[in-house]
Amino acid sequence: MSATQNYGTGRRKTATARVFLRPGTGNISINNRPLDTFFGRETARMVVRQPLELTESTEKFDIYVTVAGGGVSGQAGAIRHGITRALMEYDETLRGALRRAGYVTRDAREVERKKVGLRKARKRPQYSKR
C-alpha cells in the first residue's frame, strides 16, 4: 500500500464504508465498480460527491471505497461520511467548512424497533370504544 493515502470510516444507518483517498484524477470506485454503475440513482451519486465539491477537490483524488450493509441511501450517506473524514485527515483546515455543511456529524438516526402488541414501531391497532 502507498504511504500517500488517507483513510476514513463512514457510517449511516446500518451501512459502513471504508474510504481511501489517493492523489489522482477524480476516479471514484466503490467495491471495484465505478460510481455511476454502483449507484443507479443520481441523488445517491450527488450525495457521494458533496464533500469533494464543497472542498473543490473533485479532480485531486482517486477514491477507493468498500461499503457493506444497509441500502442505497444508507450506503451513500456512509460513503459521504467516510470521504469527509478522509479529507479532514488529509487537510485539517477543511474541517470548518465541512462542519458548517453538516458532513462531519454522524447521522445517528436508526430504525426504531417494532414493539409487541403494535403493528409497527408506533402504529397501533384500531381502537374500538364499544
Curated annotation (Swiss-Prot):
Gene Ontology molecular function: RNA binding; structural constituent of ribosome
GO terms for biological process, alphabetical: translation
Keywords of the record: Ribonucleoprotein, Ribosomal protein
A GO CC annotation given for this chain: cytosolic small ribosomal subunit
Keyword Ribosomal protein: yes
Superkingdom classification of source: Bacteria
Pfam families assigned to the protein according to its UniProt record, in alphabetical order: Ribosomal_S9
Family: Belongs to the universal ribosomal protein uS9 family.
Name the UniProt record assigns to this protein: Small ribosomal subunit protein uS9
Lineage: Bacteria, Pseudomonadati, Pseudomonadota, Gammaproteobacteria, Pseudomonadales
Designated gene of the protein: rpsI
